[in-house]
Amino acid sequence: MLYTKKLNKKKLNTKEINIKTGKKFYSIRLHKINEEIKAKTVRLTGINGVQLGIVPIKEAIFKSLELEMDLVEISPNSNPPVCKIMNYGKFLYEKNKSNKEQKRKQKIINTKEIKFRPNTDTGDYKVKLRNLTRFLENGKKVKISLRFRGREMVHKKIGINMLNRICSDLKEISSIESFPNKIEGRQMTLILVPKK
């Protein structure tokens, strides 16, 4: 079926109507099709990818109409432009489907953050460590922030010892992505990644 068929004696080339809201919107197509192609001659490719040579645009449109397909301009910058006979609606559907599948296959890594203090008590430490192990086992990246307040800034070694303790407790299930060498602002950050 032709993509640019006349509907109620109007072409739906660029202006289309949203059925749910009834509002008009303008869709932008990446490819010119059928009568939109302004070149006088085109390099024509058939349905199965067979090269049909350089033909006048009228003949190319006639061949596409004969097969009840669309003539789609694939490469407008080449001389003469490359056009292919295909079902444009099906082409857009398959392209959209493959884009959705690629997005679905992408692995999204979420970063979870847990805040510590240099003098975090053992009970709080165990609870936070349990949360860290749960996040790492679920495949999430973990950011550990160690915040310093007031005179705690003088005791950097206590903070570094705390981060080393966290690393040693989680070494079976995680690996270190970045370990802080210095205090940035009033905090040190450690990033752990789950082992694969």
Swiss-Prot record:
PROSITE patterns: IF3. SUPFAM superfamilies: Translation initiation factor IF3, C-terminal domain, Translation initiation factor IF3, N-terminal domain. One of its GO terms (cellular component) is cytosol. Keywords: Cytoplasm, Initiation factor, Protein biosynthesis. GO terms for molecular function: ribosome binding; translation initiation factor activity. It is found in: Cytoplasm. InterPro entries: T_IF-3_C_sf, T_IF-3_N_sf, Translation_initiation_fac3_CS, Translation_initiation_fac_3, Translation_initiation_fac_3_C, Translation_initiation_fac_3_N. One of its GO terms (biological process) is ribosome disassembly. The keyword Protein biosynthesis applies. The keyword Cytoplasm applies. Pfam families: IF3_C, IF3_N. Belongs to the IF-3 family. Monomer. NCBIfam families: infC. IF-3 binds to the 30S ribosomal subunit and shifts the equilibrium between 70S ribosomes and their 50S and 30S subunits in favor of the free subunits, thus enhancing the availability of 30S subunits on which protein synthesis initiation begins. This is Translation initiation factor IF-3. It comes from Wigglesworthia glossinidia brevipalpis. The gene is infC.
